[in-house]
Amino acid sequence: ATPSPPTLYGLCSCEQPNTDGSLAYGCLAMDYIPQITSVSWKKDNEPITTGLKTYPSVLNKKGTYTQSSQLTITESEVGSSKIYCEVRRGESVWIKEIPDCKGDKVHPTVILTQSSSEEITSRRFATVLCSIIDFHPESITVSWLKDGQHMESGFVTSPTCGVNGTFSATSRLTVPAREWFTNKVYTCQVSHQGVTQSRNITGSQVPCSCNDPVIKLLPPSIEQVLLEATVTLTCVVSNAPYGVNVSWTQEQKSLKSEIAVQPGEDADSVISTVNISTQAWLSGAEFYCVVNHQDLPTPLRASIHKEEVKDLREPSVSILLSPAEDVSAQRFLSLTCLVRGFFPREIFVKWTVNDKSVNPGNYKNTEVMAENDNSSYFIYSLLSIAAEEWASGASYSCVVGHEAIPLKIINRTVNKSSGKPSFVNISLALLDTVNSCQ
């Protein structure tokens, strides 16, 4: 057979670049006799020795040969160089320049957007989003500047996402509200294929109404202290920035607390609770609520402990009944529990009927009030009951808890057959006091 030279074709993968950012070049040698000696690759005049895969030659039906070779290389390695395929047979050399596999350059559209002033104030930080849209090839560099100085932290750039041959990406900058409201200039800088684009956005000049967080600590309820083995401390943080961290400690030891809840009574509050033993609370130990946030120069701390009481005074408890003439004349009558002479002021008063708890909605307690000499306190509790229930002989108990009581709890019980309780006229002033406390 008469020798014939190879016909060379330069090939590119249909989708460039590949998902890993690499480019695939192909070299196809066809219709030659005899077989060729070698297939090699060059970048400009430099031999390429990695990323090569040359397939065995194939004898065609018409008696000629075909052979192919593939080069896998990254865009950055190619740069602006030209890629060549070189085929040898003996002393003969054939060279084919491979077409540019990088495709057309499409520079991105860069858009900056920011969160609203209301959101910045409520969440205590500003978010600036840099959207980088429709570019090719994939490789880009994103950086942020503040007043012209490169920033090292505070932003996150997402991986690129390819759709229909072009790519998109986003970069998100987070700025503390106090800093945002100081009129600084923030710049998103995008570099793509030798072209750099910058987009600027300026923080607000409106003063930030971002008051420092305020910590309020709430002790456990007196009922919990007297009746339960564990008690709950509550930390309410007002003016809390978004993402605030609230923790509890006791003498430098971290305590396991309930997850902080945001919001509380208002949109800027955080509530955190911790359960401790009642014994630890009664011992007077100090417990700390610690508030941390990136916008705070140092953590905020507040402490709480049970105050030592030196002059405990046990309450006296009496149940008073409406005037006798009212009992038979009305469908309802009132029982009043008078608790007086106690110190300190922390106390609980509730009712039971036949040893079952009465719904708190069915009775009303006044505020704890100081006696005339201001050395002790008193409180009233008013229970309204149906006359027929009283007539049936049901037993009603006023249950009082106070730390000065030896057994912590006092019960005073009354019913129709237990003997006549004291009959008193409930003054309008007392009723007004009860009603005003609801």
Swiss-Prot record:
Superkingdom classification of source: Eukaryota
Keywords: Glycoprotein, Immunoglobulin domain
One Pfam family, short name: C1-set
Region listing for CH4, in residue ranges: 309-418
Glycosylation sites: 164, 200, 245, 275, 374, 411, 415, 425
PROSITE patterns: IG_LIKE, IG_MHC
Sequence segments annotated as region (CH1): 1-99
Protein name: Ig heavy chain C region, secreted form
Region described as CH3: spans on this chain: 206-308
Ranges for region CH2: 100-205
Keyword Protein transport: no
InterPro entries (alphabetical): Ig-like_dom, Ig-like_dom_sf, Ig-like_fold, Ig/MHC_CS, Ig_C1-set, Immune_Resp_Modulators
Natural source organism: Heterodontus francisci
PANTHER family in the cross-refs: TAPASIN (PTHR23411)
